[in-house]
């Protein structure tokens, strides 16, 4: 397998999908954007535009597990979404445990001086995507071209 240089991270949700980008050379991930979704289905043209712009070597999709590590109700949907990404765009897709990333992202938003209030009005999905992608980068240095 060729070494990975650039990755996209995705925090999958039924109404919003957070996107982050990470680079092997820095070993760092950062938030990129939040896409709207209808019952878990994104605007595939916008996903295509992100892939065309960033040309990722792989995509890491957050896998929502229960706190005991068992699959949650959303796990199957996230895995199906991962397969669709691979099938539509031919890019390698990994999944990564995303437990507590949204909770941590909300804390990070507050630490940055973000507003309290509705999660839908102040989405943290892209921050959560960056956190899960950072976790994947930290756990898989052997796959990175550093």
From Swiss-Prot:
One of its GO terms (cellular component) is cytosol. It is an enzyme of class 3 (hydrolase). It is found in: Cytoplasm. The keyword Nuclease applies. SMART domains: YqgFc (SM00732). InterPro entries: RNaseH-like_sf, YqgF, YqgF/RNaseH-like_dom, YqgF/RNaseH-like_dom_sf. One of its GO terms (molecular function) is nuclease activity. The keyword Nuclease applies. CDD domains: YqgF (cd16964). Keywords: Cytoplasm, Hydrolase, Nuclease, Ribosome biogenesis. Its EC number is 3.1.-.-. One of its GO terms (biological process) is rRNA 5'-end processing. Belongs to the YqgF nuclease family. Could be a nuclease involved in processing of the 5'-end of pre-16S rRNA. PANTHER family: POLYNUCLEOTIDYL TRANSFERASE, RIBONUCLEASE H-LIKE SUPERFAMILY PROTEIN. This is Putative pre-16S rRNA nuclease. It comes from Pseudomonas savastanoi pv. phaseolicola (strain 1448A / Race 6).
